[in-house]
Each structure stands twice: as structure tokens, then as C-alpha cells.
């Protein structure tokens, strides 16, 4: 009986020390916080612990999809920390470069573009990354989304595109005969 208890206790302790289980519990907790009206990713308290758990899980998995999942979420956490945007972008690019023929690569590039625009206010680089996404993944749903977002970044300003066209037309009136 003592031996059976020891085996069960050992299995439980191993399960608790599994980095992937810790990461999944963390992701679930962050999701529950977000559903309850909180902002799990914006809450930067304990971000290093969260990042460490996700990186340990990413390093311990053999599956590309799980590795990408943990890396992307850890990058999201990095992006939420003041001064962490460039580290997040680096992580997104690592995923994109490591998985160039998978949808996770496209999602990573899109996330990098959003981070450039939202966190660093660098529309030029965001547009470059979106163009890279369209070139790497032509004809995909992510490419279509990237094109739409790129158009918003290119044409969006204080005035709408139609207002700009109207202003241009009124400034250059046709010559009178």
C-alpha cells in the first residue's frame, strides 16, 4: 500500500512539474481573467514568471504547434510590458522564421506588424512586415487580412481617404476653355 501511495505521489509531483501543464494552466487562467472582464495580457504584474513558464514549456515540447503557441503567448506578454515591444517582435520573427510554411508563421508576422504599429507607432515598419507576410503567404486568408490592414495603415490619417480625394479634386479644377 505504501508503495502504491509513493507511485501515485510521484506521478502527481511529476505532473505538477511538467512545464507544458504549467503553461496550459497559466493560459487558462489568463483566458478566464479576460472573459471575466479583466485584461490578462495587459496586467504586467508577475510578467517575468509568466514568461519563464511559457519559455520553459516551449523549450520542453517537441511539437511545432505547441512551441509556436507558447512562444506567441510569451511574446504577447512581452509586448504588454513597457519597453518589451522589440523583444516581442524578435520572438514573433523567431516563430515566423522557424515555421515559414505553417500558418503560425503568418500569424507571427501579423502580430509583429500589429506590435510595430500599436506599441511603437511605427507604421512604416508595420507596412513592411505586412508586405512580407503577403509575399510569403500569397492567396491565404492571412494575406487578405494583412492587405486590408496594410491599406488601413497606408491610407488612414486624420481625414478619410474620400475626404483626401475630394480635396485633391477641388484643388485641381479642370482648365476652362
Language model regions located:
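Specific register positions within alpha-helical solenoid repeats of the TPR/Sel1-like families, i.e.
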Residues: 31-38, 76-79, 114-117, 151, ...
Amino acid at each position: 500500500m505504501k508503495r502504491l501511495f509513493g507511485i501515485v505521489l510521484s506521478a502527481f509531483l511529476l505532473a505538477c512539474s511538467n512545464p507544458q501543464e504549467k503553461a496550459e494552466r497559466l493560459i487558462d487562467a489568463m483566458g478566464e481573467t479576460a472573459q471575466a472582464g479583466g485584461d490578462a495580457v495587459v496586467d504586467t504584474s508577475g510578467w517575468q514568471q509568466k514568461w519563464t513558464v511559457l519559455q520553459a514549456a516551449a523549450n520542453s515540447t517537441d511539437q511545432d504547434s505547441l512551441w509556436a503557441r507558447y512562444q506567441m503567448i510569451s511574446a504577447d506578454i512581452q509586448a504588454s510590458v513597457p519597453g518589451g515591444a522589440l523583444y516581442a517582435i524578435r520572438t514573433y520573427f523567431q516563430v515566423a522564421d522557424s515555421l515559414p510554411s505553417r500558418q503560425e508563421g503568418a500569424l507571427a508576422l501579423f502580430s509583429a506588424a500589429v506590435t510595430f504599429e500599436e506599441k511603437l507607432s511605427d507604421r512604416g515598419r508595420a507596412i513592411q512586415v505586412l508586405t512580407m507576410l503577403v509575399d510569403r503567404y500569397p492567396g491565404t486568408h492571412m494575406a487578405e487580412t494583412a492587405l486590408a490592414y496594410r491599406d488601413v495603415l497606408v491610407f488612414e490619417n486624420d481625414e478619410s481617404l474620400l475626404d483626401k480625394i475630394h480635396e485633391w479634386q477641388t484643388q485641381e479644377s479642370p482648365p476652362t476653355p
